[in-house]
């Protein structure tokens, strides 16, 4: 498993997101951990979609959809995809 950390702006604050690359028979996904605005740990996944894009799994926290493109950009920049 390969990992990297990226700081992403959420609202008015910067938060650290730790990305872990995982691969199985269904393909590649990234398991991501961070903390919410109350400093409670959260985790979620992004999976590869069409056109080499990355999408949140359905049912993710609503505020994550606002930074989905930044999360996808972080994966592309890491060159681990």
Model-derived features with residue positions:
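Negatively charged, low-complexity tracts enriched in Asp/Glu with abundant Ser/Thr
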Residues: 1-25
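Residue-level detector of functional hotspots within protein domains
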Residues: 3-5, 16-18, 30-32, 40, ...
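Compositionally biased, intrinsically disordered low-complexity segments
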Residues: 11-13, 28, 70, 78
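Acidic, low-complexity intrinsically disordered segments
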Residues: 40-81
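A short, structured beta-strand/loop element
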Residues: 22-52
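A mid-sequence interfacial segment
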Residues: 1, 12, 34-37, 77-81
